[in-house]
Amino acid sequence: MGNYLSVAVELVCGLGILFIILKLLGKTQFSQITPFDFISALILGELVGNAVYDHEIKIKEIIFASLLWGVLIYIIEFITQKMKSSRKFLEGEPNIVIRKGELQYKVMKKNKIDINQLQSLLRQAGSFSIQEVEYAILETNGMVSVLPKSDFDKPTNKDLQIPSKSVSLPITLIIDGEIVRDNLKEAGVDEQWLKQELKKKNIDKTEDVLFAEWHKNKPLYTVTYEQSRST
């Protein structure tokens, strides 16, 4: 029983330490990850994971090792912010893999990327043919940024001489049958208005709604549990 309790305490402490360190280091540890970010997060996770199941290592040692690793990563991140020359070495640099519509084979080979991988990355960026691309930049996080050729670029309202309209963010009002009350205030509506809108759609209870979204000047969008099960 004592061993189980010890593992439980170490897991909770390890989780808390990792969470605090990631909050301090910023979102780059789990979003838009670079090779260095990946290595640092992997080692930090392994450090705590191995320590949890090694009964000879005490909680104080886990905390010390994790905090020391966090401090080292923070120092390196600080250096990359202050010294531009260090960024290329630690984080890498963007590379142009398509320039003026032409594939840059040497750059692709240098970055260990083949045609199939490039096509997949282009599709994720919204381009389904290499012929549509004027420039494609392989970013340090492994994603591709695309500048389409003018013939394939989407026309803007300005191009079509259409008067611009103000835009607003869609706001989720119901998730899993529960009203998100903070979002009601954000949308400038109340619970009574929401129930009235649901009645217009022949929905009697909010518990029947899987998802509901408000968007300015648009009707309330809803998906009921019944609808989701029938598709």
UniProtKB/Swiss-Prot annotation:
**Taking the first listed entry, what is the main subcellular location of this protein, grouped into a coarse class?**
membrane
Record's family?
A: Belongs to the UPF0702 family.
Subcellular compartments: Cell membrane
Q: Please state what the protein is called.
A: UPF0702 transmembrane protein YetF
KW Signal (keyword) present: no
Q: Which organism is it from?
A: Bacillus subtilis (strain 168)
Under the heading InterPro entries, the entry gives: DUF421 (IPR007353), UPF0702_alpha/beta_dom_sf (IPR023090), YetF_N (IPR048454)
Its transmembrane ranges are 5-25, 33-53, 59-79
